[in-house]
């Protein structure tokens, strides 16, 4: 019962969707023509009464009523409630389709895990898939009117071959008042366990895989049952329906054409048929009809699911896969492209133009950069962001005014760190201390002991303010230093890196 028009819209062309307007089966005209005729009939009856039946005084009162209804009908949020409602219904409709129990994955697992070409092996495989099909039939006849008309009783299910008479007795003897669509799945599990004990299923991993696929199949059957049980809340459906009907009830009065001689605003024309009001009714009422048709896709409407077709298809292909196709393989041969370095299937004359189109390499494949933008930049000696001196980061971490007094302990230590980590020139950085270059295995001797790491060393004196003459540092007595190994000689500082010596010490002083 599904209306398929996919081939008609395979290619976008002039008037592509316009051709679909001429279809009748599954169309909005087929759903809405009765309501549209009723609305037009009521409208014309009121218009005729206004023109030919009412007295002059009654006409003036009716005209005031028309203006009032036309003014306040727009307060009803028809578009708002219809938009949310139809979106909810369409999402629910697609989710129900995704829950249709298809046996394709299950039949492949059965064919690959239940072994035996004898009649016993065939019996196991066919019975397992028959149980899966029986579970689908039982749930579909519970939710679909089309399937229920096909299998109105369990006797019809037995006569169709989905259930044996012995299985029917066991099915009916189960003391349960709930829907028993799950019973064939339990039979499936018991039969699979028996096949494992007999060695038809060779290991527990295969049995686990088989039962996992069964649980997926059973879960879809259960979701169909719950979708049928739990509907869209009734209050939501009622609100949408009342909003639509009350809006067009107000339009029956408020959209009447009044006598132009009375001089009412926006009533300069006197037409008999309200063209745009009918179009508005067609759109809004058709919108509600879409939700009405999709809210339960297991009925007998033109666009409802083909449940009986699915039952026939699933039963046939499942039996074909586990019986006739079991262990049926073609002779292994080398493929056509066995010795080809690049395998490519041929193209017909209608599709060969696609070979001339370049393959997609990525969205950044065609981006070009200037030559200077592709040069790597040296980042040696940078511990912070670009353009920031090494001491700036330490100074930003200190609170305002803390240790900035010349001669203070914190100020002297910060000044020492600035002198130690700064890069002045290639000569000064190449031989900043005597421990930088020592023979391998010899103990380094350095006169630049770190007062932060060795509390026994005296703290250095505060440097004098930077003057016109360069600052000269006189090292103290040489003492062995074994706590921290000084780094090796550095390369020359980049020209864009400013030296913090002088300016930093002036600020600290």
UniProtKB/Swiss-Prot annotation:
Region (Disordered): 454-509
GO molecular function per UniProt: bicarbonate channel activity; chloride channel activity; intracellularly ligand-gated monoatomic ion channel activity; ligand-gated monoatomic anion channel activity; ligand-gated monoatomic cation channel activity; metal ion binding
Regulation of catalytic or functional activity: Chloride channel activity is allosterically inhibited by GLUL/glutamine synthase (GS) which affects the gating at the aperture in the absence of intracellular glutamate. Inhibitory effect of GLUL is relieved upon increasing of L-glutamate intracellular level.
Expression (tissue specificity): Mainly confined to the retinal pigment epithelium. Expressed in colon.
Binding annotation for Ca(2+): 10, 293, 296, 301, 304
Biased composition (Pro residues): 457-468, 489-498
Subcellular localization(s) per the UniProt record: Cell membrane; Basolateral cell membrane
Membrane topology: Multi-pass membrane protein
Parts of the chain on the Cytoplasmic side: 1-31, 83-238, 289-509
Family under the similarity heading: Belongs to the anion channel-forming bestrophin (TC 1.A.46) family. Calcium-sensitive chloride channel subfamily.
Assembly and binders: Pentamer. Interacts with GLUL; this interaction tethers a fraction of GLUL to the membrane, causing a decrease of cytosolic glutamine synthase (GS) activity and inhibits the chloride channel activity of BEST2 by affecting the gating at the aperture in the absence of intracellular glutamate.
Protein name: Bestrophin-2a
Source organism of this protein record: Homo sapiens
Name of encoding gene: BEST2
């Amino acid at each position: 019962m599904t209306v398929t028009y996919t081939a008609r819209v395979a290619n976008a062309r002039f008037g592509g969707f316009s051709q679909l307007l001429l279809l009748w089966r599954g169309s909005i005209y087929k759903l809405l023509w009765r309501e549209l005729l009723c609305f037009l009939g009521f409208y014309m009856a009121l218009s005729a009464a206004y023109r030919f039946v009412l007295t002059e005084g009654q006409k003036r009162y009716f005209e005031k009523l028309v203006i009032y209804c036309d003014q306040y009908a727009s307060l009803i949020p028809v578009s708002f409630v219809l938009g949310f409602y139809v979106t909810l219904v369409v999402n629910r409709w697609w989710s129900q389709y995704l829950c249709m129990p298809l046996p394709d994955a299950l039949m492949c697992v059965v064919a690959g895990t239940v072994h035996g070409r004898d009649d016993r092996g065939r019996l196991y495989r066919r019975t397992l898939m028959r149980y899966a099909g029986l579970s689908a039939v039982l749930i579909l006849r519970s939710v679909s009117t089309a399937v229920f008309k096909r299998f109105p009783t369990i006797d019809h299910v037995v006569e169709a071959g989905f259930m044996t008479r012995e299985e029917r007795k066991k099915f009916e003897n189960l003391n349960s008042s709930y829907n028993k669509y799950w019973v064939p799945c339990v039979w499936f599990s018991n039969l699979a366990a028996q096949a494992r004990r007999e060695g038809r299923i060779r290991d527990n991993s295969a049995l686990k895989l088989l039962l996992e696929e069964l649980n997926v199949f059973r879960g879809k059957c259960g979701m169909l049952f719950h979708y049928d049980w739990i509907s869209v809340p009734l209050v939501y459906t009622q609100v949408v329906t009342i909003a639509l009907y009350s809006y067009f009830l107000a339009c029956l009065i408020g959209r009447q054409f009044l006598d132009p001689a009375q001089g009412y605003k926006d009533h300069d024309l006197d037409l008999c048929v309200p063209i745009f009001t009918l179009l508005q009714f067609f759109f809004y009422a058709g919108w509600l009809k879409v939700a009405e048709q999709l809210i339960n896709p297991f009925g007998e409407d033109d666009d409802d699911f083909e449940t009986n077709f699915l039952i026939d298809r699933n039963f046939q292909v499942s039996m074909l896969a586990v019986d006739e196709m079991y262990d049926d393989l073609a002779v292994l041969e080398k493929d056509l492209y066995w010795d080809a370095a690049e395998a490519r299937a041929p193209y017909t004359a209608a599709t060969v133009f696609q070979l001339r189109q370049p393959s997609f390499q990525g969205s950044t494949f065609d981006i070009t950069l200037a030559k200077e933008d592709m040069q790597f930049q040296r980042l040696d000696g940078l511990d912070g962001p670009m353009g920031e001196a090494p001491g700036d980061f330490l100074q930003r971490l200190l609170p305002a005014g803390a240790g900035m007094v010349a001669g203070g302990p914190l100020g002297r230590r910060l000044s020492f760190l600035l002198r130690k980590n700064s890069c002045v020139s290639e000569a000064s950085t190449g031989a900043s201390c005597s421990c930088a270059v020592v023979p391998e295995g010899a103990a380094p001797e350095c006169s630049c002991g770190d007062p932060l790491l060795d509390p026994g060393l005296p703290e250095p004196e505060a440097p004098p303010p930077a003057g016109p003459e360069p600052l000269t540092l006189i090292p103290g007595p040489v003492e062995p230093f074994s706590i921290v190994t000084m780094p090796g000689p550095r390369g020359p500082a980049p020209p864009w890196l400013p030296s913090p010596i002088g300016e930093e010490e002036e600020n600290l002083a």
